[in-house]
Structures are given as structure tokens and as C-alpha cells.
């Protein structure tokens, strides 16, 4: 926006639990359109809505964009745990604590925390963390099976956005004074090659606190 020198009302973002293959197959799904001008958001949502695809609207552009990018780090961690053989309890812990981490970070950046509880947040997280169609989940799964980052990159179908995003989450956390234990642990996986067990050990290394 700053580069193009255009008002924020001219920009919109779309995000949600939208695995592209399932949308192409016309399976029922929904998304969220965010724009500072809610009328513009409604115009775009109307253009996107079909008998199998529903669009909702919000003014929270910051929250929606953060949900769409930061959840990929959580998907990497869940995929890694599943690839290493851990079950639903572990996956649910990572997803839930990851969502709490991202919500706190989003709120510190000026986002509406309710966005993280909606389609763009928890909805997208469920889809991304539970499907082999998700590049980030698949990439993480390959790491959990013992592949290196380089090997996982070679066998992955497309770019796993969570790989470069992990360090960005850690940096944002430092900027806003928000702890990011999950993103920090995944950053160590990607940069130092620590195992899934070590990654989980870092998460459990946190001091006892209220949920």
C-alpha cells in the first residue's frame, strides 16, 4: 500500500479454510474478505459467493492477513509431530497453543482477537493442520519422518510458506514483547535441525502458567 501510494480502502485480503483442490472440486467451503471499507469487502464477497462457496466480511485486515500466514508455522509443527508418529493429543496441543500464541501476537499488532477464532483463524488452522493437501503439513510431516529441510524441500509439491515465516513470527514476538515458544522451537528445527522430540521438549520447557 505504501509503495503504490493508494488508500487502504482500495486493498482487500481473502483468507480462510480454502484448500484449492477442494474448492476446484466444488466442495462446500467458506472464506473471509477483509477490507477497511466494509462496502468494498461486501462487493468482493458477493462476487466470490456461489452455491457452494460462501464469503463473509470483516474490517480486520491485519488479523486476517496474520492468520493466513502465521498459521503455517503451526501446520509445520503439527505435520512434524504426526510424521514422527505422535497422535491426536499431541496435535491438538500444538494447534491450541499455537493458536493462542498467534492470537496474542495478533492482538499486540492491533488485530481483533475474534478474527483468530473465526474462519480465517481456527477454521484455516483446522484445514491446514489436518490435510495432506496442505503443503505446510506435508513439509512438516516429512521433517518428522527424518528428512532434512533440504530433502523435504526437494520432495515437497510447492512452497511451504511456514518455513520463512517461522523466523518472522519470532521477530514479531520480540518486537511486541510476546512470547513465541512454538515459532521459536520450529525456527530451531529449520535452522539447527533439531528433532521432533527436541522441539516438543522445548515447548514443555516453559514454566507453569495459566492457560
Predicted regions and their residues:
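Rossmann-fold dinucleotide-binding core
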Residues: 1-87
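Hydrophobic alpha-helical packing residues
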Residues: 44, 48, 101-106, 169
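Short, well-structured alpha-helical segments that form the helix of a local strand-helix-strand
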Residues: 45, 95-99, 152-153, 200-201
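Short, structured loop/turn "capping" segments at alpha-beta junctions
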Residues: 54-57, 87-91, 106-116
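NAD(P)-dependent Rossmann-like dehydrogenase/reductase catalytic/cofactor-binding core
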Residues: 71, 75-82, 107-117, 121-211
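Ligand/cofactor pocket segment of small-molecule handling proteins
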Residues: 89-92, 96, 102
